[in-house]
Amino acid sequence: QRQMCIRDRITTMFGNGGIFCWYSYVTPLMTHVAGFSENSMTFIMVLAGLSMTVGNLMGGKFSDQYGAARVVKYTQVIMASGLFAIFFAASVSWLAVILMCICTAGLFAVSAPQQLLLLRNSRGGEMMGAACVQVAFNLGNAIGAYAGGLPIDAGLGYRYPALVGVFIVLIGFVAVSLYSKRESASLSRI
């Protein structure tokens, strides 16, 4: 059970951290690469917020239908794919906005099932589990922002944080895949 809690934290930290690699630098990407004006960023951020709300609702609903681990796993695939597409398509303004909405929806679609997994694996210490999921989320935010800034500091440009984010999300994907394999094996023994 302790290994599963650690895996849940890794899944949360890196799965979300990959999005923060890119999202921490979304304004310069949208203004310098996609070609939006600074004034349009308010509306673009409203779209990101609406996407987060929709993603949160979808993540909870799909977790009830398909299971939390499965939702986390597939949502992280969508997030990694969105980040990969952003790397290549950020200069197409309308596509950059659509991909932003997909990634921000994914960021919040994955949150409820991640919390559910951590609470489920924290039996007897649910309050500590709830605190740990928030710590993991915040660490992911910090790690993602730092890692996303490295290619910018190296002069590679504002597309590259998304590419770094792909690899970080994939770490979370591997962790949740190991969890879901173990969960499937334990269910098949019942």
Residue ranges and their predicted role:
Residues 2-6:
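Short, small-residue-biased leader/transition segments that mark boundaries at the very start
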Residues 55-68, 152-153:
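Helix-to-loop junctions at the C-terminal end of transmembrane segments
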Residues 166-190:
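Multi-pass alpha-helical transporter architecture, strongest
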Residues 69-114:
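C-terminal transmembrane helical hairpin of 12-TM major facilitator-type secondary transporters
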Residues 38-46, 127-131, 162:
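Small-residue hotspots at the loop-to-helix junctions and early N-terminal turns
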Residues 120-158, 165:
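A late C-terminal transmembrane helix in Major Facilitator Superfamily
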Residues 49-57, 141-142:
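Residue-level signature of mid-helix packing/kink "hotspots" within the transmembrane helices
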Residues 7-46, 50:
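Extracytoplasmic gate region of multi-pass secondary transporters
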